[in-house]
Amino acid sequence: LEFLIKRIYIFPTLIMKKIVAYIVLIFFITIYLISSHIGYMKKVTEWKYKSKTIFASDKYSYGDLYGMSYYPIKEVFGSDSLTVPIDKYPNTKNKNLCLVHDSYLGGAFLKQKYQLSGIDTIFDIEYPWRNKPSTPILLDTTKINILVFEIVERHLLTLFDSLTATNVVKFKINIPNAINKRQIIQDEITTASNNSPIEKIVQILFCENVNTNLEFVIFNSRIFTPFKEFKSYINNTFFDRKATDIFVSANKKYMFYSETRTSIEKKITNAEVNKTVKLLNYVYEYYKKKGFSEVYFSIIPNPVSIIEPDCENYNNLIPLIQNNKNLIVPMIDIYTVFKKTNNNIYYHSDTHWNKNGFQLWLNEFNRKTNE
C-alpha cells in the first residue's frame, strides 16, 4: 500500500516535469525558428525598437555608440534642443534637388524640407553601401536642377570612387537599356519565394545569421541593460577595457567610433589629395554634362576632427582638399562652420551630429545654393 501511495504522488510530478520540459523545448524551438526567418526577424526587430516594455530594445535609445559598448556616457538620442539660429531665405520653389547621401542626411533632412530655400522636388538617393534602392530621376528642364553629394569624412578615401559616384544616380531615360535596382530586388524576392519547401527548410535550419539573431531576440532587451552597463563599468574601471569599436575623449564626455580616429590619423600624401581632388572634379564635370545646373560636394567632418583634432593628430584631410588650388567643385563647407561655432554639434554617445550640427548644415546649404 505504501508503495502504491508513493507511485501516486510521484506520477503527477513526473508528468509536470515532462510538461515543463516540453514547454521549454517548444519555446526555444520557436525562438530558433523566428531567429532563422527573415520575415519574422523583421517583425521582431520593428516591435523591439517601438515597444516600451522591458523586453523591448533600448540599444539605440542613447545613441549607436552607447548601444555598441554600454559605456556610461549616454544621452537620450534626439532629446537635445536647438540653440543655433535658422537662417531665412526666399522660398521661390524654382529648384529641384538630387541628394546623394549617407546616414547623416536622408529621413531627417527630408522632414526639414520646409527650411530648404527654393527647393520644390527632392530626389532621395543613398550610397550603395547603405543597401537601399533608389528611384531613377527625371530632370525638369524648366527648373534649376541641383545635385549634392554628402559624404562623411571617414568614407571619402575608402568607399567613394568614380564607379560608385557615376552610377549612383539613375536617370529615367536610361531605363530601357539598364536594370532598375528595384527590379533586381523584386526579382530576388520572387526567386526566393519560388524555392521548394525543402530549400526553404534548409535556409531556415542553416541560417548564417542565426547566432546574431538569437542574441538579439533573447538578450537585446531593457531587462538586461543594467547588467550590460555594470559589466562595461567593471571592464573599464578595473581592467581598462572598452569595446574595440569605440574610444573615449580625453575629457571623458564623448565617445567616438574607432574608425573615425584611424581615418584622420593616417598620414595623407600630396598624391592622395591630388587624386581625390581629381576624382571630385571628374564627378562634377560628369554630372554637369548629364544636365545638372550645379553639382556640390559636402564632406561631413568626423566628430573627432572637430572635438579633439590635436589629441588625435588630425591629418587635415578636409582642408587639404577644400583649399586645393585645382579643385573646381563648389563645396558646401561645413568644416569651417563647425570649427568656428561654440555650440555643441555632435551627440556624446552617437556617431552623428545633433540638431545644432544639422541646422548649421542646412544654413550653409541654403547660403551656398542661393549665391
Predicted regions and their residues:
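Extracellular glycan-modifying ectodomains
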Residues: 1-371
